[in-house]
A protein has these predicted regions:
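Membrane-embedded alpha-helical signal segments
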Residues: 1-44
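Contiguous, well-folded functional domains in the mature portion of proteins
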Residues: 38-198
Length: 198
């Protein structure tokens, strides 16, 4: 089709691909996003180390503990997950919003230093069709670490039976020599959780 987009592989590949393509097609031209990401990553080659902050107040757990094989098996990348205590999501890095899923339960970011971060609010929450998710950003928007990017009805979703454990994964983990999990347990927004080494 001319311009290409990166697809995150795993059992969700069909859903993820269709949602990403749908968003990029209907909300912003693909070439605009590509240009913004290109401008955003000018310092990528110079960066040797990068940290990823906690995006939600709650309890950090290892990705292997998430009750979904796509995440626990590392199929979508390395990272961590948070059991949230409040329904507010903040940017874990300085960078650009690469994509917001049509159902608003997930988004992808690219940091100014090249990390591709996928945040998935809860498990199976795609089934809500966007209900209870209030995105504050759109694809192509620049954000600062600690900036509020989404609010969601945490208690309502729990009452409806959803597990709101939120995976945060580095989808381009193969570009790093190592990824170190620095903290497990209770965390506040902005605390360093992952360190990425080139």
């Amino acid at each position: 089709r001319g311009n290409s987009i990166q697809i995150i592989y795993g059992p969700y590949v069909t859903v993820l691909k269709s949602e990403l393509e749908d968003y990029l097609r209907t909300r912003r031209a693909k070439k605009e996003i590509k240009q913004l990401l290109k401008e955003n990553t000018h310092s990528k080659d110079k960066m040797q180390q990068e940290s990823i902050a906690c995006p939600i107040k709650g309890c950090v757990i290892e990705l292997e503990e998430v009750g979904d094989e796509a995440f626990s098996g590392g199929m979508l990348g390395e990272g961590f997950a948070v059991k949230p205590e409040e329904g507010k999501l903040y940017a874990p890095v300085d960078g650009i919003i690469a994509a917001v899923f049509r159902t608003k339960h997930a988004l992808a970011m690219e940091s100014k230093d090249g990390a591709e971060v996928l945040i998935h609010l809860g498990l199976d929450t795609v089934k809500r069709g966007g209900k209870g998710f209030y995105m504050k950003v759109e694809a192509g928007q620049k954000v600062k670490k600690g900036e509020l990017i989404c609010e969601f009805d945490l208690e309502d979703m729990r009452v409806d039976g959803y597990v709101m454990t939120t995976p945060v994964v580095i989808s381009n983990n193969a570009e790093y020599a190592s990824i170190s999990l620095k903290h497990i347990g209770e965390c506040n927004v902005g605390e360093e959780i992952l360190t990425l080494y080139k």
